[in-house]
Amino acid sequence: MKPVDRSRRNPGIDLLRGLSIVLVVIHHTAIRLPLHKSLLADWLPSRLLDGLQYDGFEAVFLFFVISGFLITSNPLARRGRLASIDVRAFYRRGAAPIVPCLLALVAGLSALALARAPHYTMEQPKQTLTGTVMSALGLYLNVYQSNTGWLPAGWGVLWSLSIEEVFYLAFPLVCLLLGRTRLLVPALVVLAMSIPVVRASIHHDEIWAEENTLQGMAAIATGVLAALLVRRWSAPRPSTARWTLALGVVGLLAVFFAGSELWQ
């Protein structure tokens, strides 16, 4: 195995990724072991526990932003511009780490479902193992889950992969079509700015309100725009960097611990 080239790593991205992992793990753990019923409730304020238990879900969208940043930064570093992206190489590099793991996970979950293992068997009337497998491999599991009800947790977490990989498939084609025009950035801006509108317009479906495709793609588009901005702008002055960092921290804290007030 080749050693990791740490000179090419971005410490800020690594920090955000690590923070996202911790928050998502806490969120999923708290579904089974509510934080308000743990010893933490004796020491931590209720608002903090609410943020960790419920708004930790928002860390998934932080993952989306990071993904958008990375899938844009890598082709820019190799080619210099998105209009000349190598589509085959892009798909090959993206599929290598994901497809084997996805197939292994689907195979394992299918075996558990066939064995009727508790918490791994479809319980909703409209759900079937075949339909679930097809939606996972066809990258529309978020749509399937919205139409049929909550899937067992092992399957349900694949909703975010469905959104991300659909964007991943479309991204190089859009770059080839719009990369040589002035339409790419405005299109990404419109998509990124659609998040509040999308959230405000969905009330009838709890699952779709959380897992709708447009909302996830808007977060990924935000990461794409960030990568393009970093590419175009020179390194900021230290004071500007500190203020930008402070603004980002305040924004993250507001989303995680005052999310209800923000979206009302």
Regions found by a protein language model. Give the residues of each.
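Short, Lys/Arg-rich, polar N-terminal cytosolic tail immediately upstream
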Residues: 1-12
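Interfacial loop-to-helix transition and helix-capping segments at the boundaries
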Residues: 10-11, 48-60, 123-135, 150-163, ...
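Residues within membrane-spanning alpha-helices of integral membrane proteins
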Residues: 14, 18-21, 67, 99-106, ...
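Transmembrane alpha-helical segments and their boundary/interface "anchor" motifs
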Residues: 16, 57-60, 76-115, 126-135, ...
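Aromatic-anchored segments of alpha-helical transmembrane domains
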Residues: 22-29, 111, 142, 190-201, ...
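Helix-to-loop transition at the C-terminal end of transmembrane segments
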Residues: 30-37, 111-124, 201-205, 262-263
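Specific transmembrane alpha-helix
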Residues: 59-76, 96, 160-175, 186-236, ...
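Alpha-helical transmembrane segments and terminal signal-anchor/GPI-anchor hydrophobic tails
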Residues: 230, 236-264
